[in-house]
């Protein structure tokens, strides 16, 4: 999957995103204009490499420092500051496409499969992705579609908790956290300071902590 790890989009010393066949071939959200995978040497002090494409393989991508791939929705690539690890580009807070995806989720909750399919296909048509049928319309497909549409934007944990899929999908797709995920991890521990400050009644800790 494009999101190999669900780590709240916190950068560390290795790339967190990996490209696979997660998108349909026609889907423009997977284009080089949206997800940059091709990088070229631009250091004039390296004449043997200058202008040539950097080679990133399946064996080396994971150790490529904050590079592969990059989401251009957040990335300026301004030549005056090549060391810039972020950008000042505005972040989307509300998007029409997510409204349709939320409508799809609501209709799934009502078991209105055709209505859910109609809602998600509005987003897929705009992305030039093939429309899906009722038989393909599942909560898992919707969660995958949210990755394709909102990668880097949504608070994924909240989405997975809301849909009751946190444990299942973390254990299935997250090779780092999945093996140690426990049922009680759907909730976080309540800070002890909050518990202590509640003097009017007993304030129990969440189970497992």
Residue ranges and their predicted role:
Residues 1, 86, 90-93, 124, ...:
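Long, intrinsically disordered, low-complexity segments
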Residues 41, 47, 108, 166, ...:
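Amphipathic alpha-helical interaction segments
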